[in-house]
């Protein structure tokens, strides 16, 4: 018995139509279905579910590093930055990053969910940590 992959990612959103437009137009998601309070899209091979919940607190989300990261090609990195700026997306400062840790840009969706576009892979990250973080214990070889 094993878990084979991430099945889907679900975001609570305050305005379904605004969020559909963001994920469709900004992140090039393919809209599969939308209803009164739910929509499903795919971004790459990832299923994204949006569920509208209008009356819940949303202020804590900005204090967390919790985020979803999508892979992009390094040669497209600057083009993505320009695209996000042209579309008035809220780009975040991000954390200091060594070039060996590859490139990332962080931004938020209309409800403040943090999203990262990252040029590296898990293998890149593990190799970087092995070189830079001697305090870490590694369990599998990459």
From Swiss-Prot:
Broad class of enzyme this protein falls into: transferase
Gene Ontology molecular functions: magnesium ion binding; transferase activity, transferring alkyl or aryl (other than methyl) groups
Pfam families: Glyoxalase
UniProt cross-references to NCBIfam families, sorted A to Z: Fos_BSH, Fos_BSH_Sepi, PRK04101.1
Record's GO cellular component terms: cytoplasm
Cofactor: Mg(2+)
Function of the molecule: Metallothiol transferase which confers resistance to fosfomycin by catalyzing the addition of a thiol cofactor to fosfomycin. L-cysteine is probably the physiological thiol donor.
Subcellular location: Cytoplasm
Organism: Staphylococcus epidermidis (strain ATCC 12228 / FDA PCI 1200)
Domain VOC as annotated: residue spans: 5-120
Self-association state and partner proteins as the record states: Homodimer.
List of residues binding Mg(2+): 8, 67, 116
Coiled coil start-end: none
Protein name: Metallothiol transferase FosB
Enzyme Commission number: 2.5.1.-
Keywords: Antibiotic resistance, Cytoplasm, Magnesium, Metal-binding, Transferase
Residues annotated as catalytic: 116
Superkingdom of origin: Bacteria
Family of the protein in this entry: Belongs to the fosfomycin resistance protein family. FosB subfamily.
BP-aspect Gene Ontology terms: response to antibiotic
């Amino acid at each position: 018995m094993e878990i084979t992959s991430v099945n889907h990612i679900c975001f609570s959103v305050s305005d379904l139509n605004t969020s559909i437009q963001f994920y469709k137009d900004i992140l090039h998601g393919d809209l599969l279905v939308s209803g009164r309070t739910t929509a499903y899209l795919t971004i790459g091979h990832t299923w994204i579910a949006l569920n509208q919940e209008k009356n819940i607190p949303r202020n804590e989300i900005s204090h967390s590093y919790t985020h979803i990261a999508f892979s992009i090609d390094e040669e497209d990195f600057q083009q993505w930055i320009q695209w996000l700026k042209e579309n008035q997306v809220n780009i975040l400062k991000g954390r200091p990053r060594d070039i060996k840790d590859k490139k990332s840009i962080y931004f938020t969706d209309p409800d403040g969910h943090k999203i990262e576009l990252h040029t590296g892979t898990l293998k890149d990250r593990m190799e970087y940590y092995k070189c830079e973080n001697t305090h870490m214990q590694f369990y599998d070889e990459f």
